[in-house]
């Protein structure tokens, strides 16, 4: 078999099908450690730099198993193809290289059906390269999106395939870790862009201000979408309760941990808000199914590869956080678990507020890489180890 080009969605399918492949990442060590291919199941991955292949071809080739299919990943497609040609020269039989480079993995969205009823269908769109989740709610021939990424063509294509008109798009907060797609979706479709003025008041986005407790529905009735203000991760953080059963929680409630309140440089002030919100969350219906905006790793997914957990289980899993009754102790806990935020987060916030504009290449550069939005990534990992 000659070398061939494959798509990011094919790589994901091979990984969840547990195919016998080796993922060969030929980026430099720094980029590899910052962001790499992840899967729900264990798989073999090697990091051997493209530059090493150029300078030490024989030694690099010797590191690869000849009895397995090789799938090459690099920052750019051309570099991966170059390494694939080296392996073909050395008589490797099944070698593929990723179309579009690592950015295509970073932008990949996987639609997973959460629930299908006569009156509605709810989808989770998993972005493995960012460890993030967005959502789509369909009723009749209308669809609403929640926290869409900048891969706007995916969402519009998803709607078109189902003969749906996009009527609303919601943000849970002003995102810092990825470039949001609501503004462009609204511009291209005429859908209403909803956001909390606590985050968006200084932006140049043409958004419609949310009101705490208000409800939305579809033209044919369908499920309700209830707005719940949950400040803390940001002052305008908002959750959405769907059909009284699900809560799209953004970066407020995670399956492991809660949203970090320090990304705006006001850790103590926002930690106070988060402490109050945690009290509010504990009073919600504990049977609500939590649908988070991010996950730490695939271990949080259920057997259907969905990131979803009943609120009572989330509270129990994170009792080391939700169980802190004293506000001063909670704020100290947050401070003890703070860590530097990626430098690009400040710029991404400006882009999402429409205060700065960049071309597609720069936006992709900013958008690439796994999120760091949990308040206590280290503490949560220790608590669940």
Predicted features along the sequence, with ranges:
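Rhodanese-like catalytic fold shared by cysteine-dependent sulfurtransferases
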Residues: 1-22, 29-69, 76-145, 152, ...
């Amino acid at each position: 078999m000659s070398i061939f080009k494959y798509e990011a969605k094919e790589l994901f399918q091979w990984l969840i099908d547990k195919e016998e492949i080796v993922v060969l990442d030929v980026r430099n060590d720094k980029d590899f450690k910052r962001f790499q291919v992840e899967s729900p199941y264990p798989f073999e991955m090697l990091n051997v730099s493209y530059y090493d292949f150029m300078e030490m071809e024989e030694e690099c080739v010797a590191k690869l198993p000849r009895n397995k299919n090789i799938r090459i990943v690099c920052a750019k497609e051309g570099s991966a193809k170059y390494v694939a040609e080296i392996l073909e020269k050395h008589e490797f039989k099944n070698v593929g290289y990723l179309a579009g480079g690592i950015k295509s993995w970073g932008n990949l969205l996987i639609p997973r059906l959460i629930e299908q009823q006569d009156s509605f269908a709810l989808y989770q769109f998993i972005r493995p390269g960012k460890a993030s989740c967005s959502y789509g709610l369909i009723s009749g021939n209308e669809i609403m999106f929640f926290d869409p990424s900048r891969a706007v063509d995916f969402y519009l294509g998803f709607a078109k395939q189902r003969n749906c008109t996009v009527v609303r798009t919601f943000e849970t907060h002003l995102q810092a870790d990825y470039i949001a797609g609501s503004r462009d979706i609204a511009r291209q479709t005429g859908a209403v862009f909803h956001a909390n003025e606590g985050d968006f008041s200084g932006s140049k986005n043409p958004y419609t201000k949310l009101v705490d407790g208000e409800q939305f529905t579809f033209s044919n009735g369908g499920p309700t979408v209830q707005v719940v203000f949950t400040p803390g991760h940001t002052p305008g953080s908002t959750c959405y309760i769907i059909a009284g059963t699900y809560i799209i929680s953004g970066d407020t409630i995670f399956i492991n941990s809660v949203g970090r309140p320090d990304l705006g440089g006001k850790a103590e002030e926002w930690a106070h808000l988060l402490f109050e919100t945690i009290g509010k969350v504990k009073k919600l219906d504990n049977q609500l199914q939590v649908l988070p905006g991010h996950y730490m790793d695939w271990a949080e997914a259920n057997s259907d590869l969905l990131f979803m957990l009943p609120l009572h289980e989330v509270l129990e899993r994170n009792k080391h956080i939700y169980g802190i009754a004293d506000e001063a102790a909670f704020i100290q806990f947050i401070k003890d678990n703070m860590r530097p935020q990626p430098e690009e987060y400040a710029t991404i916030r400006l882009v999402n507020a429409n205060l700065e504009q960049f071309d597609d290449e720069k936006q992709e550069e900013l958008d690439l890489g796994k999120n760091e939005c949990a308040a206590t990534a280290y503490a949560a990992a220790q608590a669940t180890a």
